[in-house]
């Protein structure tokens, strides 16, 4: 990747809906080379998806909670259940594996309210058995 690719990626990360003519103008190259670069970045897997970033407050989820999880049983059966639960619940936005702390995982969860989060947390605990 060169500096043009890096500029292109930074721009697309901010707004991938820009018309190709606007992208190429901002990057400083003509449209055909710009389109070719985007396609190459997609083919190489550097650009994986083009997504819409939602305003979670306007979507009805104004509360963000970070849940630390400490696991007592590190086996593949537990991890499979954990992975299935994470994928199933749309309120879980991110999952991070931690090292160097007492927690094993950190989950970023969105909710409609603290009460909604409390209900969700109890349901998650019952499902996964930490």
Which functions belong to the PLM regions below?
Residues 1-130:
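A compositional/biophysical signature of low hydrophobicity enriched in polar/charged and small residues
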